[in-house]
């Protein structure tokens, strides 16, 4: 029970770019036992939550998909979020799904569907319009997933790992390795560049391996600069993480980048996740590990 006599509700609002994976997301929340509503008009959101508060069903987990169909729809959503924000009995979390424009265009071509905001029928026009309209909403979002390199199962796994009630944590440290050659991860809160470390790519026996292999991991970790860097980085993060948690942040995405996302970044991401798991719920992902390594 909360201070107002109602029951506590975990509310997740799923929004973001059309084609970024909202259908997969809502299905994943259903699998987690959330009460799910697809395309609830924003103007009805405050009333919907009041009804849930007064309901005898005591649903404690709710996920709502809210799509952008036009500027009027967007304005209503912002107003609804402001109204909810003035209440003290519920704090919604916004999950924003994003992807690169080129990926979204490709997905629309594969499905042969029209973008809802494309007046000329060209997907890119609608995508650019939608991205501009959603800029403020993205800025309000507590959780941002870049699904550009995700298969549906990857997105489903990420949601389950983040929102599954059985892990009993309200703050998650997500450590991600990536390759700079494939672009920066747009959902990262902190990015660290480890391209200054000796690169096992140039050793023939290690080139086809990854940082999850012992031979590569031992090579990366044996250098003095690696040990010094990790000493300073863990000290910095140990200072920062409690403050992020205190501010109410539900997750922190720490991205470690090397050239191709195969060797150095993978080794260090694995190390950091293991280092902090004693104090935080941690999850490690390797964004580019399955991509073919090439120079």
Swiss-Prot record:
Residues annotated to bind GTP: 67-70
Residues annotated to bind ATP: 16-23
Organism superkingdom: Bacteria
Any GO MF annotation of the entry: GTP binding
InterPro entries named among the record's database cross-references: P-loop_NTPase, RapZ-like, RapZ-like_N, RapZ_C
Keyword ATP-binding found: yes
Coiled coil: none
Keywords: ATP-binding, GTP-binding, Nucleotide-binding
Cited Pfam families: PapZ_C (PF22740), RapZ-like_N (PF03668)
Record has GTP-binding as a keyword: yes
Primary role: Displays ATPase and GTPase activities.
Record HAMAP family: RapZ_like
Family: Belongs to the RapZ-like family.
Record protein name field: Nucleotide-binding protein BLi03725/BL03417
Organism of provenance: Bacillus licheniformis (strain ATCC 14580 / DSM 13 / JCM 2505 / CCUG 7422 / NBRC 12200 / NCIMB 9375 / NCTC 10341 / NRRL NRS-1264 / Gibson 46)
């Amino acid at each position: 029970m909360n201070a107002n006599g109602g029951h506590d509700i975990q509310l997740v609002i799923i929004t973001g770019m059309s084609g970024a994976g909202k259908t997969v997301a809502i299905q994943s929340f259903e699998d987690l036992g959330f009460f799910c509503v697809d395309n609830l008009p924003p103007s009805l959101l405050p009333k919907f939550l009041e009804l849930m508060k007064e309901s005898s069903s005591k649903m404690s987990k709710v996920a709502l998909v809210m799509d952008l169909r036009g500027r009027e729809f967007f304005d209503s959503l912002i107003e609804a979020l402001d109204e909810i924000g003035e209440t003290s009995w519920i704090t919604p979390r916004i999950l924003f799904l994003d992807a690169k424009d080129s990926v979204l265009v490709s997905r629309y071509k594969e499905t042969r569907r029209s973008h809802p905001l494309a007046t000329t029928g060209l997907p890119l026009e609608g995508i650019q319009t939608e991205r501009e309209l959603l800029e403020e909403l993205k800025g309000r979002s507590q959780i941002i997933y870049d699904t550009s390199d995700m298969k549906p199962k990857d997105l489903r796994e990420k949601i389950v790992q983040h929102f599954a009630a059985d892990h009993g944590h309200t703050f998650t440290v997500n450590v991600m390795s990536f390759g700079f050659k494939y672009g920066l991860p747009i959902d990262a809160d902190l990015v660290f560049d480890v391209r200054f470390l000796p690169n096992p790519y140039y050793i023939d026996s290690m080139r086809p391996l990854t940082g999850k292999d012992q031979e590569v991991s031992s090579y990366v970790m044996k250098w003095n600069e690696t040990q010094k860097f990790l000493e300073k980085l863990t000290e910095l993060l140990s200072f920062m993480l409690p403050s992020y948690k205190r501010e109410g942040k539900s997750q922190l995405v720490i991205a470690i980048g090397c050239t191709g996302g195969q060797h150095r970044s993978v080794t260090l991401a694995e190390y950091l996740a293991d280092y902090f798991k004693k104090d935080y719920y941690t999850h490690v992902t390797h964004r580019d590990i399955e991509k073919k390594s090439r120079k």
